[in-house]
């Protein structure tokens, strides 16, 4: 099942997240042979499909000297060696070209594991975590986008909380974690999620995630 938010959603709140706090163990792809033209990014050495790169992931590029040129939202994966990307929040219809060039150093990191934990947490709060067959009941959520902000805040909470102990700037990261804890709890308190139990496109039930705090495993 898809998470309720993606990496590009996180960047709308934390533009430097993938530059500052990328987790090496969660790196999908990287290389030194990136090339750009329009919104097309290619890497002859890549295997984007096998790496699991998907729309909503974030492409970070640098020049050979290590100077950052930005982070961009993946729009689509065209082949094993080619993807389309543009400024975060834009679509193919209103896309902005990538900086043109060759020999780009690039990284595709993800916080999908954290977003997946938050997805399960939100479903648990809604009583949808597991059915009799051992499957979750996310399909019952009529409008999954209503959970996007909660997913973003919960994911950022886990990212900052998880890295606050090890980093030199741990105090600042802990403060960020506390901020997203407040935003997460506030979002949960006002959320009302409509459920469609008979797949007719209409709500049969409305639930609130409640006020239980997100706990790290």
Regions from the PLM with identified roles:
Residues 30-34, 105-106, 212:
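Generic structural motif
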Residues 3-94:
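Autoprocessing Asn-cyclization modules and mimics
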Residues 54-55, 91-116, 120, 124:
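Surface-exposed interaction regions enriched in Ser/Thr/Asp/Glu
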Residues 1-28, 157-217:
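Short loop/turn elements at secondary-structure junctions
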Residues 108-195:
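Internal mixed-charge
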Residues 31, 64, 127, 197, ...:
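Glycine-centered flexibility motif
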Residues 34, 51, 95, 110-113, ...:
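Short linear motifs in intrinsically disordered/low-complexity regions
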């Amino acid at each position: 099942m898809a998470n309720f938010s993606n990496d590009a959603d996180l960047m709308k709140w934390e533009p430097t997240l993938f530059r500052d706090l990328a987790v090496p163990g969660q790196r999908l792809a990287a290389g030194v042979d990136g090339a750009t033209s329009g919104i097309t990014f290619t890497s002859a050495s890549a295997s984007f499909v096998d790496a699991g790169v998907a729309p909503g992931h974030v492409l970070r590029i640098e020049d050979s000297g290590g100077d950052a040129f930005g982070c961009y939202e993946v729009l689509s994966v065209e082949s094993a060696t080619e993807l389309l990307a543009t400024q975060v929040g834009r679509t193919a219809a209103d896309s902005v070209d990538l900086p043109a060039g060759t020999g780009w150093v690039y990284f595709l990191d993800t916080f999908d594991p954290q977003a997946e934990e938050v997805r399960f947490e939100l479903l648990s709060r809604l009583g949808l975590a597991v059915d009799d067959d051992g499957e979750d009941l996310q399909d019952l959520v009529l409008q999954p986008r209503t959970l996007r902000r909660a997913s973003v805040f919960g994911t950022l909470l886990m990212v900052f909380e998880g890295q606050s102990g090890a980093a030199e700037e741990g105090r600042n990261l802990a403060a960020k974690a506390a901020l997203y804890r407040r935003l997460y709890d506030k979002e949960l308190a006002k959320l009302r999620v409509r459920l469609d139990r008979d797949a007719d496109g209409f709500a049969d039930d409305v639930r609130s995630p409640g006020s239980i705090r997100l706990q790290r495993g």
